[in-house]
Swiss-Prot record:
Gene3D superfamilies: Trypsin-like serine proteases. Residues 1-18 form the signal peptide. This is Snake venom serine protease 3. SMART domains: Tryp_SPc. GO terms for molecular function: serine-type endopeptidase activity; toxin activity. SUPFAM superfamilies: Trypsin-like serine proteases. Residues 25-249 form the Peptidase S1 domain. The lineage of its organism: Eukaryota, Metazoa, Chordata, Craniata, Vertebrata. Its EC number is 3.4.21.-. Keywords: Disulfide bond, Glycoprotein, Hemostasis impairing toxin, Hydrolase, Protease, Secreted, Serine protease, Signal, Toxin, Zymogen. One of its GO terms (biological process) is proteolysis. Monomer.
């Protein structure tokens, strides 16, 4: 555990040297230590880092492009430099995809469900987040969080996770920005039209939380981050709830939604 913790500290503090691009929170503030109990850190020794969400004691939900060799998973982390007594470390026992983790041809299949090698114990800083019971409404105010960059394009990275409030926007706005997106997809378009707040490099795989439920997974966005009228893309978790719950129930051959 000590070795894993030291490695995680180095990764979080040296994210600017990471080999893989992902998303981070711009324009937010330090998350309250008790508001991100479901937020997990995915990392390896090569410098890859992503976020994820604990959805029950045995499963984490994240983005497919966050798959990495020799993945380690940390739960209950708030500060990269100060250890929480209840932090827990796990390995992935099994990974489930709707699409090959290396295939980026389908915009809305960037989702990965991870079964942990051991169950997680709830604690002061660790608790699962509920899956959505319905999709978010247009205009909903939602919370995005992670250890991603807090400045862009010259990235700097925080010692603690940052949180920001953003809005669910019309899908057509994202489609106008990101050429090649289909007329309909299982993607949420979210951000602030005036810019200044959004996920950024390092936040990939982390949660978009609306009314206390996991509605989105940080998937893709602009570079530099948080540009005016350039919202980011989030996987629409509601459309995958049957797939997720079927796997958790033991049906690991369930068909991914088309």
């Amino acid at each position: 555990m000590v070795l894993i913790r030291v490695l995680a500290n180095l990764l979080i503090l040296q994210l600017s040297y990471a080999q893989k691009s992902s998303e981070l929170v711009i324009g937010g503030d330090e998350c309250n230590i008790n508001e991100h109990r479901s937020l997990v850190v995915l990392f390896n020794s090569s410098g890859v880092l992503c976020g994820g969400t604990l959805i029950n004691q045995e499963y984490v939900l994240t983005a497919a492009h966050c798959d990495m060799p020799n993945m380690q998973i940390l739960l209950g982390v708030h500060s990269a430099s100060v250890l929480n007594d209840d932090e827990q470390a796990r390995d992935p026992e099994e990974k489930y995809f709707c699409l090959s983790s290396n295939n980026d041809t389908e915009w809305d299949k960037d989702i990965m469900l991870i079964r942990l090698n051991r169950s997680v114990n709830n604690s002061v800083h660790i608790a699962p987040l509920s899956l959505p019971s319905s999709p978010p409404r247009l205009g909903s105010v939602c919370r995005v969080m992670g250890w991603g960059a807090i400045t862009s394009p010259n990235e700097t990275y925080p010692d603690v996770p940052h949180c920001a409030n953003i809005n669910i926007l019309r899908y057509s706005l994202c489609r106008a920005v990101y050429l090649g997106m289909p007329v309909q997809s299982r993607i949420l378009c979210a951000g602030i039209l005036r810019g200044g707040k959004d996920s950024c490099k390092g936040d990939s795989g982390g949660p978009l939380i609306c009314n206390g439920q996991l509605q989105g997974i940080v998937s893709a966005g602009s570079d530099p981050c948080a540009k005016p009228r350039v919202p980011n893309l989030y996987i629409k978790v509601f459309d995958y709830t049957d797939w997720i719950q079927s796997i958790i129930a033991g049906n690991t051959t369930v068909t991914c939604p088309q």
